[in-house]
Amino acid sequence: MSEFTDYEKKKLLKHFSNTDKSVFAIITPRQVDRGALMSRYSRTDKSMRKIFLDEFLKNKNRGEEFYTRVLLEYGDDSVAELGGGQIAIEGLSNIAVKKIEDRRIGFSYLEKSSRYVSWDKKINGAYKFCREHDIMKSSFADLYVNACNLDFDVYTKNIQPMLKLIRENDSIENYNFKDKSGKNKKFPDLIDKNDIKSEQRIYNAATKAKALDALRSLLPASTLTNVGITGNGRAFEYLLSIMFGSGLSEERELASQIKNELDTTIKSFVRRSNDKYGQVLQKYLNDIKKNSVKLSKLYVSGKPTKGSFVKLVSYEKEKDAINNVISALIYEQSPSIEFSYIQKNIKRIPRTEKIKIINQYAKIRKNRRHRPPRAFEMTDYTFDLLTNYGMFRDFHRHRALTLERQLLTTDHDYHTPNEIVELGIEKEFSECMENSKNVFEKIRRKLPEQAQYVVNFAYNYPYFMKLNLREATHLIELRTVPQGHTDYRRIAQKMYRLIEKKHPILSKILKYVDMTEYELERFESEKRTEEKRKKT
């Protein structure tokens, strides 16, 4: 006999994907009800659909009431992870978007790309960069706007010349394409009109990406971007508390806007972000910042390094790392033996046998998506990095690691892409950089955080990353794929060499690191995309 009457089934089908199976999707429209249902689920022997009929169907405010009681009265934060929201933010600066993307857990992001989309278009006669509130009401307003306008002017007027240079240096005639019969042919040998159009599309996309890659170095951190965010309620609440407590007016204003929009979908989950509890958290975070500033003034001395570098500053002896990795590799399948005893057993294995074990696990990886087992999380590395800010933005997307960064400044000099020199605009490029530096130094004296907005992507930026070998494998293999930006490919390759030097045995697990240099990085990727498009 069915658990539900026909009338109940009819009602339930508006909120669940089925009424008679043990696996079902929760499709009730309100996120707060979805989360509350799952949370109630853990404290009753009723089925979820029965809970819905008994408690939620007749009371439209049941979910809100539940969260108000659980979150405010009991402080059970984990229940806020059971509901989520999706928001889009358009027209925020690269300073603000990085602050948002600093949050690692509970979020997924997708940001507007600087290699596929150009920033040359104006809105109402103005380039798309943030007119930061505190700067614009200061005596630096004109200097700031003029510096950003200069960056965009040079960027805009050189898009077509850069595209022309890249296409002259790397002609479409040099490349092989698949025709409709599946044969590889040089472009001049293609006959079919559709094949010709298809291959021109591939080439145009790849060359445009390379041109924009080179020119993005000119863009200032004030450049406006768009980002889509999916996250759970708890993550959003923490993000909002951080942004409400920010020293930057743009970030505080964004916090208000995000909160207003989330109140329409997951209000119960973000209620505390700026109430008395949220403000206590904001004070705590600002106290941490103040303490760090004091300690820095007390104990840190030296001059900023010029140029870029990658240093491996912390790692363990490979002998110890191998023992821990192998112990973890066999732990799950071991016959009820505790980890410390397994470690003792592994230490007695001859080194040659240990090398064979690591090589075995490397051998069974057939592509880079075959992640190494979790055992390879047992050893980690700390890298000290100084790379251009544009490149940092790509590495910043990796979240299964510890990344700390400093304020964006002009202290570390800047990187000039080879294509800028080849195009003959190095002088103009340098003038942009020097102008930004001069304006930055003036703003910095009174508004050090706000001064970041005028700094170009080309300027070198300091940060460190601590990551385990499993995550290092993912990051380095992904960031050395042929279609990757030259800047981050080279940094990832250097990271690999440093790991290989210190851990020659364990580094064998990094099987899919591409050390080759490519002229037109996006070409093969665009070819694969076009071939898939043809099949659909």
Feature map (PLM): residue ranges:
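A conserved ligand/cofactor-binding region detector
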Residues: 1-536
